[in-house]
A protein has these predicted regions:
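Individual transmembrane alpha-helices with interfacial aromatic-anchor signatures
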Residues: 133-149
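Membrane-interface interhelical connector segments
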Residues: 45-61
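Alpha-helical transmembrane segments of multi-pass membrane proteins
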Residues: 33-47
């Protein structure tokens, strides 16, 4: 096994730390984006959180469970967003808040169609939800909510990753 030089080890450690920090930024951006999305949901269809999202965990009708689950999902999908953008080929998508918000918008729409439109109805059927939505379940409000999520996710993530470190 070849020994690695101290500078090479240092670069590896710094690279790993940068990835860990970006993933944390992804979680924070995902959480803030989910809060923004949740406001949009609350203004248009609060029952989505109370019934459908809570129903994923067998707690249909429990707004607190729906709210917590939604926040956790949003943070986890924020980490996934950060993980994807950690790839060197995609890293330039975080150069500016506008470019990253656009990337986030596309990401949010993909989550709407795949996650909420396909996976969620299947998951609800598996856990015995009373009346799971038809497949695929893609509505204008669903797309709009996830667009809010994606734009906020991308904008916040770009801001966090491009801000100078604090002393």
């Amino acid at each position: 096994m070849a020994e690695r030089s101290v500078p090479a080890l240092r670069r590896t450690a710094v690279g790993r730390l940068a990835v860990q920090i970006r993933w944390r930024y992804g979680a924070v951006a995902g959480l803030l984006a989910t809060l923004a999305m949740s406001v949009a949901i609350a203004l248009t269809d609060l029952e989505t959180l109370r019934v459908a999202v809570a129903g994923l965990y067998g707690s249909e009708g429990n707004l607190l469970v729906g709210w917590i689950a939604h926040l956790l999902h949003g943070a986890l999908f924020g980490v996934l967003f950060a993980a994807v953008l950690t790839d060197a080929a995609l890293e330039d998508l975080t150069d500016s808040p506008a470019k990253c918000a656009g990337t986030g918008a596309v990401y949010g729409l993909v989550l709407a169609v795949v996650g909420a439109g396909i996976v969620m109805p299947i998951w609800l059927a598996v856990v015995g939800f009373g009346a799971p939505p038809s497949l695929p379940h893609v509505t204008i409000p669903l797309l709009a909510w996830h667009l809010v999520y994606g734009v906020v996710l991308g904008g916040v993530f770009a801001h966090l990753t491009n801000s100078p470190p604090r002393a």
